[in-house]
Amino acid sequence: MVAITAALVKELRERTAAGMMECKKALVEANGDIELAIDNMRKSGQAKAAKKAGRIAAEGIILAKVSADGKYGVILELNCETDFVAKDAGFKAFGEEVINAALAEKIADIDVLKAKFEEQRANLVAKIGENINIRRVAVLEGDILGTYLHGARIGVMVAATGADEELVKHIAMHIAASKPEYVKPDDVPAEVVAREHQIQLDIAIESGKPREIAEKMVEGRMRKFTGEVSLTGQNFVMDPSKTVGDLLKENNADVVNFIRFEVGEGIEKVETDFAAEVAAMSKQS
């Protein structure tokens, strides 16, 4: 039996907006498997579509650059421990040096990039007094590349065809705001579709609908689901009356691929439970 910790219950509450007791019960029934707990809660109507895991906790900056010929681009995440250091001139200069090297030498392997700058990173850590991590790097190649940085916390790079610079920037801004996971509805992996289909079917059947009617209901829900998680299926943030797919079609353009980085995605700082800490100190005294 997996121990159901307060941290696990807290994460499930944040992702489902359900009550504490419901979350604890769901985790017990799922033997601590948070994804299974979410699926079961959705089927029973205790939770709507859950938020994705990936609480933003780490600090740092996102950098993105495209080569002079516009055909090759690099996007990079550089982490530190505090927002104060993220704004430090020396930290930013280090990030610029790293991404310039990644672009010039076409370094797409994070381990190679880390090794190249390890000595400088260690020196900067000693100077600043915080841990610094070249966390991830990704590259795109294409006919037309565009980037968008929202502050220094969100970065997007888009590879497109048939689009001008302004359109690519608008698409990148949309991606920054709407967080699509795939380019087109057809790109959603079969296992993701199958999982969502089963959840929606169970919900429909448990609501009392005959299986045949439930199947037809789910067809519509699945079209909505794949549209919502894909770029071309989403309503365009600057004009919600049309989808991004409509916008691209109007301009005889297409998006081949995109990358979206947000500072600290998937990283959690260790959070101290103050009450537990006080209790522990009391026992020691």
Curated annotation (Swiss-Prot):
SUPFAM superfamilies: Elongation factor Ts (EF-Ts), dimerisation domain, UBA-like
Family annotation (CDD domains): UBA_EF-Ts (cd14275)
Keyword annotations of the record: Cytoplasm, Elongation factor, Protein biosynthesis
Coarse class of the protein's main subcellular location: cytoplasm
Keyword check for Protein biosynthesis: yes
Keyword Ion transport carried by entry: no
Region Involved in Mg(2+) ion dislocation from EF-Tu: start-end pairs: 82-85
Compartment list: Cytoplasm
Single GO term (MF): translation elongation factor activity
One of the protein's GO biological processes: translational elongation
Pfam family, one: EF_TS
InterPro entries reported for this sequence: EF-Ts_dimer_sf, Transl_elong_EFTs/EF1B, Transl_elong_EFTs/EF1B_dimer, Transl_elong_Ts_CS, UBA-like_sf
NCBIfam families: tsf
Family membership noted in the UniProt record: Belongs to the EF-Ts family.
Role description: Associates with the EF-Tu.GDP complex and induces the exchange of GDP to GTP. It remains bound to the aminoacyl-tRNA.EF-Tu.GTP complex up to the GTP hydrolysis stage on the ribosome.
Record's protein name: Elongation factor Ts
Gene for this chain: tsf
